[in-house]
Amino acid sequence: MIERGKFRSLTLVNWNGFFARTFDLDELVTTLSGGNGAGKSTTMAAFVTALIPDLTLLHFRNTTEAGATSGSRDKGLHGKLRAGVCYSVLDVINSRHQRVVVGVRLQQVAGRDRKVDIKPFAIQGLPTSILPTQLLTETLNDRQARVVSLNELKDKLEAMEGVQFKQFNSITEYHSLMFDLGVVARRLRSASDRSKYYRLIEASLYGGISSTITRSLRDYLLPENSGVRKAFQDMEAALRENRMTLEAIRVTQSDRDLFKHLISEATNYVAADYMRHANERRIHLDKALEYRRDLFTSRSQLAAEQYKHVDMARELQEHNGAEGDLEADYQAASDHLNLVQTALRQQEKIERYEADLDELQIRLEEQNEVVAEAVDRQEENEARAEAAELEVDELKSQLADYQQALDVQQTRAIQYNQALQALERAKALCHLPDLTPESADEWLETFQAKEQEATEKMLSLEQKMSVAQTAHSQFEQAYQLVAAINGPLARNEAWDVARELLRDGVNQRHQAEQAQGLRSRLNELEQRLREQQDAERQLAEFCKRQGKRYDIDDLETLHQELEARIASLADSVSNAQEQRMALRQELEQLQSRTQTLMRRAPVWLAAQNSLNQLCEQSGEQFASGQEVTEYLQQLLEREREAIVERDEVGARKRAIDEEIERLSQPGGSEDPRLNALAERFGGVLLSEIYDDVSLDDAPYFSALYGPSRHAIVVPDLSRVAEQLEGLEDCPEDLYLIEGDPQSFDDSVFSVDELEKAVVVKIADRQWRYSRFPSLPLFGRAARENRIETLHAERESLSERFATLSFDVQKTQRLHQAFSRFIGSHLAVAFEDDPEEEIRKLNSRRGELERALSAHESDNQQNRVQYEQAKEGVSALNRLLPRLNLLADDTLADRVDEIQERLDEAQEAARFIQQYGNQLAKLEPIVSVLQSDPEQFEQLKEDYAYAQQTQRDARQQAFALAEVVQRRAHFSYSDSAEMLSGNSDLNEKLRQRLEQAESERSRARDAMRAHAAQLSQYNQVLASLKSSYDTKKELLNDLYKELQDIGVRADAGAEERARARRDELHMQLSNNRSRRNQLEKALTFCEAEMDNLTRKLRKLERDYCEMREQVVTAKAGWCAVMRLVKDNGVERRLHRRELAYLSADELRSMSDKALGALRLAVADNEHLRDVLRISEDPKRPERKIQFFVAVYQHLRERIRQDIIRTDDPVEAIEQMEIELSRLTEELTNREQKLAISSRSVANIIRKTIQREQNRIRMLNQGLQSVSFGQVNSVRLNVNVRETHSMLLDVLSEQHEQHQDLFNSNRLTFSEALAKLYQRLNPQIDMGQRTPQTIGEELLDYRNYLEMEVEVNRGSDGWLRAESGALSTGEAIGTGMSILVMVVQSWEDESRRLRGKDISPCRLLFLDEAARLDARSIATLFELCERLEMQLIIAAPENISPEKGTTYKLVRKVFNNHEHVHVVGLRGFAAPLPEALPGTADAS
């Protein structure tokens, strides 16, 4: 039998009235007896303070303050202490006979609040010979001692071997040690437990039925159902974990989204700007180099242009000088051509005028003859017209006469008269007065002969006149010709001069005939001379272009050298062309390849980034796609292995969960059917009876009962036999044991205990050997121990499962990443680095461009040399055929000689041309000049007289002819008298008149016509004479002008002059064209020089500015790179794929990210300020600072409990994995958390039943307690009706309320609270939440109503209330309740403490005077029976018969107050024996 631990003594050091006092405590009752103020309450206060050193609970008041909530300012402790160090120490001997000293060090704290400082401590292993006062005080002399400090105590104890001193910083640790060592009955884990314990002590101290205890009897007496409570706590904890998981998911999602958003946008914002500055820096460097190259190139071009300008200016000056000479020569040639053309036109005019003059002379002679003939005819016509007119007049007169007579006679008379008139006119004209009509015929013949004679004479004179006129005109003509050729001369000299002119003309004609040959010869020589001069000019120009003077003999050799050079240069140029084409083709191929690579580079870089991420994630290095696919296969295999291991761990975890759930069943029933059968049979499960068995005894009892440890203990087997028939819903083996469940023991078996085994003699012939199980599950302690082990294993498995799930998720994500990589990037990831190839190509391109530039320069030089050589060969080709000309020095002299001869010939030709016709005309008539015809005038006069004579003869002959014609009329002489009677004559006269008038009309018409013709002939003659004279004058003028011109007007002169002019014009045009070209080239060269100068200045300015920018940017870039490298973000920011974007695209990308970042960091003041500062484009390093700030902010946000990295980018990956794991864990947990309402009702009902049985067992211990009229005390436990109805609904009608329990929005507690409110709508829940109500409903204690009843006299069982009992009865009843609570605590804590520990039991009772002797005896009996210690305080007149009594007397000596203590053991003995150590030690 295990002995119960006991408190040995209480020691007070430096308390008010007690300097160093040790009270030895009795094993049962210790009585403190003394008057008022003797120190009884101080002693008990010291004991309580040592037990519960909690200043928040300690409140020592006297009985006058009973029920008060506030007392003195120091709550009764500060005033009980003296200044300095104070101690209250308990000396305990526990069940293991270990001495344990526990206590507190107290010290007053100065101040108005009167506070006290308390330090608990414990001493183990102290020898029994050492008293507590010896440790706590130090003797100074026989009369003095001092209190040691806590440190000195510690040093003193550490010096003792085997003694352990422990100082506690918390009350919980202090009480934990006291519980483990059996000093207190209950583990006081929390302030609530300490408060309950203190309230218990306080109720014991002050006595009576404490309302605090009775109102909370359920909390004091009913233990928390560890199984039910644990199940519901696990469920609620799981729900809380579920919510935490949900919150973790939400936070993880939020963090992931935030991390993703911030990292992506910040990376885009900063990396775009970073790469833009990097690109701009590279571009600026390239531009600076390009500007420098352009600067040097422009300088060389400017120098070349300046040299070229000087050469062209010199050549232009030469051409300007030559142009004046050429213009003068051209003007002279043009003037000469004009003169030649004028002379030719003059010569043509002369020839034309000469021809016209010859023609006019012929026409004039002809016209003179025509005019003469016309004059003769005119005279005849005039005579005929006059005769006709006369006849008409005569006839008219006759007719008039005849008309007057109106007869023939009249007419004849008229005719006769007219005949007479004609006769008279003939007589007058012919001077023939004797003329008669009859002699008229004779005279007519005579006069006609005379007329004929006159006509012949006139014709003869006319012939003579013509001959004379011809001779006269020939002489005049010859004379005029001689005068025209020789000039004015005497008529007598004409003959000699004419002969001289004719002889000179023959010579001149001979010379003129040679002019054509001379002109041809001269033209040929002049052409050769011009060719010679042109060749000399070309030679001079060639020498000038060649820059060297060459002899004529060296030109052929030079021609061969130039041809050889041309051939060489042509081959070089051809090869250069091919080489240039090859270089350009290679350059184009490089550029095309570069463009292709630049397009492929971002794809390759993205593939490399993905590959690097895969390498970082996998920790592997991949050199080919085959390795990637092989690693993917390894990943698949690893994933399958991890999934298999995870599933195995998950299955083991689920098995453990099931085992934990099975072990957590109340009563230890692993099969829920057993609970139903036990309830049905009215029995109790054997495991429930042994539920409180200790952990050490569990293997024994498990082996003792063997398979029957799941048996049902029933009061009577006979009653169960009837129910066994037809029983199906039961285990295969059902054990039933007959016995009393309240007093069941293991006496039903005969057992022999072996080493770790038992032999159970079931019958005489049947034994069962059972070994102790290695994992016993019999009893609540064993099950809880197993559950703890399973929980630990489950935690390990959960951690392993989480790790495996994480690894699986990571592997799956890695597999997905590899799959994405294979699908998107495998084709290009392992190709050669395009950027490296681009760098090589750029280097090669630079070499090609330099080679091409050098080649272009060389080719340009070769081309210039080739063109120069070609021009030289072309010039030599023109010069070589003219070498003979260049060597001919006499050509100019011969040209001058031929020119002189030609001039003479041309002079002769001009003479012949001018006077050739005159000489030709003069030559046949030159002989007429020998004599001058002087009789021409006399001949002219004779001819005129002959003409007049002929005209007179003609008139006479006509008149006679008219008379002859009218001769018949003379016979009408007799008719004149008969005018009125002769109508025939009138008619004849009329007819004759008409004939005469018609004749007259014809004569007039003929005369008029001939007169007009004559006038016309005269006009023509005058016109011809005038024209002849004019042309003669003009011809003379033309000859004079031709002489004035002084130019030979031969046939080839114009052609030569035009050829010369054209040649000079061509030379002038060529010169002007060249000059214009030079001027334009010079202007262009000057403009080019100006442009180059401006370009040079601009390039110098741009180069300086760009260099300054490069230098400035370099400083900023160095700061940026220093920040980047110091913070290790270069890998994040240097995104090479961005290098292929334009500045506008990067700026747009940065601006978009900036807008998103402004929204993202709007709630973060620090990041918002850093972002605003980073927007300065002139300070790129601030963007890096912002990026670093973002990373730092994200690192601080990383939850290190779930993410094992400091890198936010890696944190995103782990967040993704953790998110998947948490989601899966949430799903699994939700499946596990589905708890059955029926099982909840069964658990609660079973727990209530067990606790009711336990309370009944506690009541058995109080049946014999009596105080005054109280004969017995008991606890009554009932189930509340509202809660009983809830249990019934949960177990039987739960399907009607599945809307609550299946709701995802309600926890089980909340659903239970809602159901309770639905079943009891009349109950006001107040301000409590459904969760709080539900948690209360899950506690079985809230289902029970407990009240204390007393059996008092004749009243029977009454509710224990202070008003219905006397003070002593109330004190006794309250003490009974407290004893029951303590016993209940011990039972509850038995499984938590070692089986060899039985805790101390001690209660207090102040003011025991209220109890009578019988009641005190009852207390003594109760203490003895329950092995409980009791400390009571009683007045001096109370002296118990048993136990130990201390008499306390407070005395004052020399102003020092002390308590005198005398200890007595009982009053039954005749002579009381003083206890040791009771001397006054004040």
From Swiss-Prot:
Coiled coil: 326-472, 507-602, 780-805, 832-1110, 1209-1265
Keyword Kinase: no
UniProt KW ATP-binding keyword: yes
UniProt GO molecular function: ATP binding; DNA binding
Subcellular location: Cytoplasm, Nucleoid
Disulfide bonds: none
GO biological process per UniProt: cell division; chromosome condensation; chromosome segregation; DNA replication
GO CC terms, sorted: cytoplasm; nucleoid
Family the UniProt entry places it in: Belongs to the SMC family. MukB subfamily.
Domain text: The hinge domain, which separates the large intramolecular coiled coil regions, allows the homodimerization, forming a V-shaped homodimer.
Subunit field text: Homodimerization via its hinge domain. Binds to DNA via its C-terminal region. Interacts, and probably forms a ternary complex, with MukE and MukF via its C-terminal region. The complex formation is stimulated by calcium or magnesium. Interacts with tubulin-related protein FtsZ.
Function: Plays a central role in chromosome condensation, segregation and cell cycle progression. Functions as a homodimer, which is essential for chromosome partition. Involved in negative DNA supercoiling in vivo, and by this means organize and compact chromosomes. May achieve or facilitate chromosome segregation by condensation DNA from both sides of a centrally located replisome during cell division.
Name under which the protein is recorded: Chromosome partition protein MukB
Organism: Klebsiella pneumoniae subsp. pneumoniae (strain ATCC 700721 / MGH 78578)
